Regions:
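Membrane-water interface at loop-to-transmembrane-helix junctions
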Residues: 135-161
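Membrane-interface helix-loop-helix junctions at boundaries between adjacent transmembrane segments
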Residues: 55-141
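Membrane-helix interface motif
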Residues: 20-31, 80-92, 172, 214-226
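N-terminal signal-anchor module of multipass membrane proteins
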Residues: 1-54, 250, 269
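Membrane-helix interface "capping/anchor" motifs
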Residues: 2, 55-73, 170, 188-203
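C-terminal transmembrane helix-loop-helix hairpin of multi-pass membrane proteins
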Residues: 96-104, 188-270
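Hydrophobic cores of alpha-helical transmembrane segments in multi-pass inner/ER membrane proteins
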Residues: 46-57, 104-126, 182-183, 243-259
Length: 270
């Protein structure tokens, strides 16, 4: 049953990602940043649909298997959409600015946070980790207590990894860099807060990169297509919003999955 549900989720993720991407296409392909998109309303519909499908995948697979697998399935759906969408060059020639890209990245990171929060609330905590009931989503603002935020600080590792690895406009390189960075962040978060459920950590890598993008966007000016052609754009500004959301969800899920028996025990006094 568990493996069957994972297989179905993968198929749904691929089909949904491809179908939604086709709605956001213009003559150059799938537009990566919707607020400046030349595709109009259909682009907004495509983004809304892919996030809705990702949410249902997270809840469904999370309930049948576990929360981490559910969020990984959601990330896969977003990842298929991201792979079909354009690069920073396409965004620039579609009149997107560095600031608008950063703002959309932050919005998508917050959506990933809502998706994570709701999945933990519906499907429950990760089964292989100790649980502090006060930190779970159903206990008011428990997911945002200091231990959660300390674990989320590990997302700094994602920023460093992306700055080192995202050197070209390749979609595979962009998503791969975010995924690997998020994986490292998850492993670090678990090592320093082994008793903290990663409700916030799943979205933290995307949010961290989005905030760095916002800071870097201020000196870049409104249009930056010339900088892209010259290769003068910072690696982090090459990442598109959906790349961040997909890589963050998938990478954190993989990182926690790879460290099931890792992490030092913490004191209960926190």
């Amino acid at each position: 049953m568990r493996f069957g549900s994972i297989g179905v989720a993968v198929v749904v993720a691929v089909v949904a990602g491809l179908a939604c991407a086709s709605l956001a296409s213009d003559l150059r392909g799938v537009v990566p940043v919707i607020p400046q998109a030349s595709v109009g309303l259909s682009g907004w519909v495509a983004v809304a649909l892919i996030w809705l499908i990702a949410w249902f995948l997270a809840l469904g697979v999370g309930k049948l298997v576990n929360t981490a697998v559910g969020l990984f399935a959601a990330g896969c759906a977003l990842g298929v959409y991201a792979m079909r969408s354009g690069t920073v060059l396409d965004a620039a020639f579609d009149a997107a600015s560095p600031t608008s890209i950063a703002v959309v990245s932050i919005v998508y990171a917050l959506l990933a946070g809502v998706l994570s929060w709701s999945t933990f609330a519906f499907a429950g905590p990760l089964p292989d980790m100790p649980v502090d009931p006060d930190e779970l989503p159903e206990h008011g603002y428990g997911a945002f207590r200091p231990p959660q935020l300390v674990a989320a600080l590990a997302s700094i590792a994602t920023v460093v990894a992306v700055a080192v690895m995202a050197r070209t406009d390749s979609k595979g390189q962009a998503i791969g860099a975010v995924t690997l960075g998020a994986m490292l962040a998850a492993m670090l978060a678990r090592s320093i807060r082994s008793r903290t459920q990663p409700v916030v950590v799943f979205a933290a890598p995307a949010l961290a990169i989005g905030l760095v993008q916002l800071v870097l966007s201020f000196p870049s000016g409104a249009g930056f297509d010339d900088d892209i052609v010259r290769g003068a754009v910072a690696p982090i500004l090459r990442l598109m919003p959906m790349d961040l959301a997909a890589g963050s969800l998938c990478g954190v899920a993989l990182g926690y999955g790879m460290t099931k028996s890792g992490g030092a025990e913490e004191s209960d006094d926190h």
